[in-house]
Amino acid sequence: MAKPSSGLVHRHTPNLEVYNARGMSVRQVAYLKADEQEPMQRLVTLTRRSANEQWRGQWDPRLFERLEQETDLAPSQQVTSALSGVTLLEESRDAGWRLTLHGEAGQATHAWDSRASHWQTEYDELLRPVLIRETAGGQPTRVAESFSYAREEGLNRRGRLVRHDDDAGSRMIDSYGLTGQELGETRHFLAALDLPDWPDAALEPGAGASTHWRYGPLDQVLEQTDAQGHRQCSGFTLGGELTRLTLHLNDGRQHPLLVETRYNAFGQVERQTLGNDVVRHAQYDPANGRLERMQASRPGRSQLQDLLYGYDPVGNVTRIEDLSQPVRHFANQRIDPVSNFVYDSLYRLTEASGREAVGAMIGPGLPELTPFPGDTSQLLNYGQQYHYDASGNLLSLRHVGQQDYTRSLNVAADSNRAVPAPGNPLEAFDGNGNLLQLAPGQPLQWNARNQLHSTRQVARTDGDDEEHYRYGGNRLRLRKVISRRVAGRQRRSETRYLPGLELHESEGERLAVITVDTGHGLIRCLHWSEGQPEGIANPQLRYSLDDLHDSSGLELDGDARIISHEGYYPFGGTAWWAAGSAIEASYKTRRYSGKERDSSGLYDYGLRYYAPWLMRWINPDPGGDVDGLNRYRFVRNNPLTLTDHFGLNPQDQHYSIKKFSKEPKEPGAERMLNGLGESGMSLLRGKGPIAEFAYNTNWSVREYLHLGASNQAGDIKRSDYEAATAGSHMRDLIGSQPLHRSRAEHSLAASTGFCDEFGIISVFLMASSADWPNVPIYSVKQPVHRSAILGDPRITDPLTVDPWVTYPVVHPWSQSHNSTGNVELSNFTPRMPGDPEYAIGYQQVDALREQHYQDLPVFDDDVMEARLDSWLATGKVWTQVSAMKDPQSVFYVLDGQQQNAAAIPSVQYDATYESLMHVARLRSNPRFAGRLRAF
């Protein structure tokens, strides 16, 4: 039984960061303690930099300890950069090497990797990719992807992508909305499973599978019509939150799925009424917003779910109790419906306890299905202990229960590649770090892009049991084909994945699974056109009651009858499951974290696969080192607290750009800027979506840094000098030249910053946004200022993003003070919309805020007034109202309506007005007037 930690393991275990003389991070030191009685262990991550301060190599804590004896020891990862700073060669002990050559505009033209694969990307005159040639090791060259763009006007498609050919087939975009959303797409699948060579690949005959969307004014999906004509209709609050969902089947039947939703003031769901009359309640800690209790009940019947969550001070889940289940006694044990969790000083899970079924073990398979869902009377207690090395590799799992066992992994000495003992990790992976077999006789095959191509469970001379996978241009799985030998015959089944719809076809059965995400649980509608199983309704609605991490615990039908009940070990293995019907249970595919579990036991997370019995990913992170130097580690070994949605990096939440353009504006507020009322410039019509994105970025940064700028006189006075105090403390902590991410995280924790922080947060938010409008993002650095632009100034006139000024207005770069003088541009263009490399997580920022910014000193007004006077005298404080050379309104067209980039969101008006009034008073004071600085 895991006992709650006393907290003593966390005493005197700070995280340290060491900077060189130029303010660049060169060493990170963590102190590990897993037990109160154990000595503390120092873990050092070393970074070596070149003369121009670019990092060249990094050594993880295991390799660092060997550096004293092996001075020429190669790092965990290293890069070779061009003189411009762009990365040419990346070398990773986990993921192999990758060489990339770039064109004059910074676009990647050629790439090679350690599996002898080669890619060549061709671009059109607008630097849009038009085709990607791929040469896998030892294979002939093929055109793996092809892109076509519309030249003609109509359907808002001009200049936009209208066809994308990929490994699964072709995707045609029928039309776009005024703000750039796709209104319709058609997917054509390949006739064969062979990898295509475009344009010669053969598509299946027919019209393809078409999906259509209808959007509301806040860009929310009001209606989705899937490829079989089923419609999902959604209703929203005035603020854009989902309140109801109705499913209209193609045969005319209608099913309310979500009847009502109620939110608290922070946008968190407090109450949901589902279409089967189940009511869900959620309670949150008002101090930090953490979920405290989650309940689900049926009117007039027993409680279905009542989960009570406990946390330590930094937010790690330490206890989960199911109050809907009674205390049981079985096999001479008292079985409490409680799970407890203990962590070391690095917040890695070290102990866990809970309940499991008789005979359950962590492995690729599921435990034996037991009858009577909801009856937990025959579960047993278990306890687990986890041991890690200095780099975060799980070395062993010790399980104590009905069956005691220990699982050990052998980790390579020079990398984080690991396999179950007594396997040899040096032989178990290819050059890019992809695992080559799940178990002896079960090989894994990978395509050139390090995506799982096929798995084989059983090898036979007369037909194997295997699965094949194909992926779309977004790198997500679109097709799964299963071949099995049954009763002397080879049988094939196939699943195709479309927006909101899965099409399953096998011998004698055709099944469409309509998937609806309520945001707090998945609803699936099983609709058979052929081969309906006996005893199952057609259609059958399945409501999933999920836990904190979206794992499907209870499945209910349309009458709130329990279909299945499942519990999980901390790292995702199924500890027990029960169902009244084995046939019904066999149609459950979404389990741990809401992800699909394949017959191999692997979970498909989207961008890679997870093996719960290994408690690690089976290939390196496709996002690189976004989650640290260990590219196999699963959610930082903290699976109860963190969630990974796509297989890139664990985040509970991250900062995002809010849609201030859709919110009410303060009438006439723009007159504070220039007094000109309706006068101003107009942007080209095609700039509308980009201008909206820039507008939302400006005001999102202003909201997150709500104290204002640390060196703007108006914001300093408005915040009662708190902006200056917190900003000065932040700069003392991060030094003169911190890493961009560290700068952004500390600034968000302090709720203020200087122009450097405002500018860096802007580019991080834009590059990590799913709404990124596919234009280059640059950080703009001048001798005394930093801002951002959307667009490449060598090709077009970009739009300026500068939320540091008191009154930010989106405007052309050519009309900006930020374009004058000596200007240095740094490229922050993401690889994809929502690029996780730039995502900033709330958890890290909250931890910094609690550690460094909670109890800042408060000085008397006289003291701060004297300091402000000193800052004004030395030119450290500004009154920069606008970044425009000629401050004026800027108009752009969106949704057919003219918008003004100088309009202030109503929720931001009071703060902006107060800062401007302070500026006016300071400028009218003869004592200050000559000292105020502005462009």
Q: Locations of the language-model features?
A:
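Glycine-rich, acidic and aromatic/proline-enriched surface loops and short helix-turn segments
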Residues: E17-M24, A51-Q54, P61, H188, ...
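Acidic/glycine-rich beta-solenoid
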Residues: D35, F64-S81, D94-A95, P129-V162, ...
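A structural boundary/capping signal
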Residues: D652-F935
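Short, flexible loop/turn elements at secondary-structure junctions
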Residues: N20-A21, L32, A51, R62, ...
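Thioester-forming pentapeptide GCGEQ
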Residues: M1-T45, S50, G208, P217-Q220
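A motif-centric feature for acidic-aromatic and gly/ser/thr-rich catalytic loops and repeats
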Residues: P533-G606
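Short turn/helix-capping motifs enriched in Asx and small/polar residues
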Residues: Y382, R561-W577, G601, L607-R608, ...
